Regions:
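Conserved PLP-anchoring active-site segment centered on the Schiff-base-forming lysine
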Residues: 86, 103-125
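Active-site phosphate-binding strand-loop segment of PLP-dependent enzymes
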Residues: 137-177
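N-terminal small-domain helix-loop-helix segment of the aminotransferase-like
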Residues: 7-92, 99
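A short helix-loop-beta submotif of the ANL/AMP-binding
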Residues: 127-133
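CheY-like receiver
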Residues: 20, 100, 151-155
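Short beta->alpha connector loops at strand-helix junctions that form conserved
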Residues: 115, 134-139
């Protein structure tokens, strides 16, 4: 039997949009964060070379050590020292976000989310038994999206474990600042 938290999740509206646009040449496929461009040749060639070398087995759990070292060096150069041991490479962004949610949230914890937002960001906490409180963006007089910061802060409680602020925001394009 499927858990109630899963059964009660709303159907994905993004999937509805994608289904309506799939196969249409006059529509750009932005619904899944995809480009309308084919993957560049150097990346396709590197993938083919990797397959030809027989690199088809499971990798290290946290990602290839040399990739984690490169990411750590890049992050260190941008910000502050980051050890490769603190880096985990995932197969996709949604996997990384779910791992983060699993590390931070338990049943009864609270998430305060700026909405509208990509539906997976609010579905993940719900799957884990956390409560999601939504704080809406609203258009100002010029039609630009704005966040009511006092309203956001008023929603934070001692049970709040995660503050979800997606910027640049999907789907509005709103940015912090």
């Amino acid at each position: 039997m499927i858990r109630a938290a899963i059964e009660q999740l709303p159907a994905s509206l993004i999937r509805e949009v994608a289904n309506a646009g799939l196969g249409r040449t006059d529509v750009l496929p932005f619904w899944f964060g995809e480009s309308d461009e084919v993957t560049p040749e150097p990346i396709r060639a590197a993938a083919a070379e990797s397959l030809a070398r027989g690199e088809t087995f499971y990798s290290h759990n946290l990602g290839l050590p040399e990739l984690r070292e490169a990411i750590a060096a890049y992050a260190t150069a941008l910000h502050r020292p980051v050890a490769a041991s603190r880096i985990a490479v995932t197969s996709a962004g949604v996997n990384a976000l779910m791992l983060a949610m699993q590390m931070l949230l338990g049943a009864g914890d609270e998430v305060v989310a700026v909405v509208p937002v990509w539906p997976n960001l609010t579905a993940q906490p719900a799957i884990l038994g956390a409560r999601v409180t939504r704080v809406p963006l609203a258009p100002d007089d010029q039609g630009a999206w704005r966040l009511d910061l006092p309203a956001l802060l008023a929603r934070v409680t001692p049970a709040t474990r995660v503050l979800l602020v997606n910027a640049p925001n999907n789907p509005t394009g709103w940015t912090l600042g």
